């Protein structure tokens, strides 16, 4: 309600040119909820229309100009006063003057660079948005519209498997192997665990997917670890020579691509955490970083078929006893209270 003439004398609305046909995707908001936003990719044009609707048609509205901005910005939650803009484009839509009726203004930002993927995390948010502003002497009228940006990658040229022998001296030696070190977000992790020596009573084994978000620089660095998935490999005691297969489907989890040193503000990395628990509830673990990437939506074989092919290839490899042994074994770390 306008009081003594103060308050918004007009409303702004932003509509995209291809809003009827453009794909929408769910994206997590700062409060943890999911909402749908229009999806864009790097290099795509962003165009549309800003409509100024007068609250009192027929009554003239003075203004100091109308503009539209396209902004990409990073906000660190511990430094909320500062917004770090890495993309900032502006177009003037109307010169200072008067409006006597509601009016629409077209805009176009051609082939816009959108270098990073949209991200909402524990301590940081990277967002892209359009902001229309009608400048007035007392109170500006503004309207924002968020969009989501995905960054696509091509298949990595080098994607070697991960093989490592780990253990506790004279107590436990295992070899774990994952078929790749880089996985797309709908991929399947195929692997196996091979027990070379078992002299302690293991009662449970699992693989966790851990997301590690790092924000800030220098003394102001914050780390947040989030366990995205827990995959039980084994429930019960293993024996020497036993081989346990792993098939972990990534499509069911809330994952993002790996992000490294984004605008020198934050990173998001993913780790496979192999966890063993003995009968005395002692926990041993070994972490291995993997790289996650997003590929375009193309026609592909079903996930189950994809997993079957990968596991057939994988299970066709020889056992560790028939392969050259590794030069050394890494130690399993014990988790302390």
UniProtKB/Swiss-Prot annotation:
GO cellular component: cytosol; endosome; retromer complex
Entry keywords, A to Z: Cytoplasm, Endosome, Membrane, Protein transport, Transport
Stretches the record annotates as Disordered: 313-337
Chief location: cytoplasm
The keyword Zinc is assigned to this record: no
Record's keyword annotation contains Protein transport: yes
GO biological processes: intracellular protein transport; retrograde transport, endosome to Golgi
UniProt membrane topology term: Peripheral membrane protein
Localization annotation: Cytoplasm; Membrane; Endosome
Subunit structure: Component of the heterotrimeric retromer cargo-selective complex (CSC) which is believed to associate with variable sorting nexins to form functionally distinct retromer complex variants.
Family label: Belongs to the VPS26 family.
Known role: Acts as a component of the retromer cargo-selective complex (CSC). The CSC is believed to be the core functional component of retromer or respective retromer complex variants acting to prevent missorting of selected transmembrane cargo proteins into the lysosomal degradation pathway. Retromer mediates retrograde transport of cargo proteins from endosomes to the trans-Golgi network (TGN).
Protein name: Vacuolar protein sorting-associated protein 26B-B
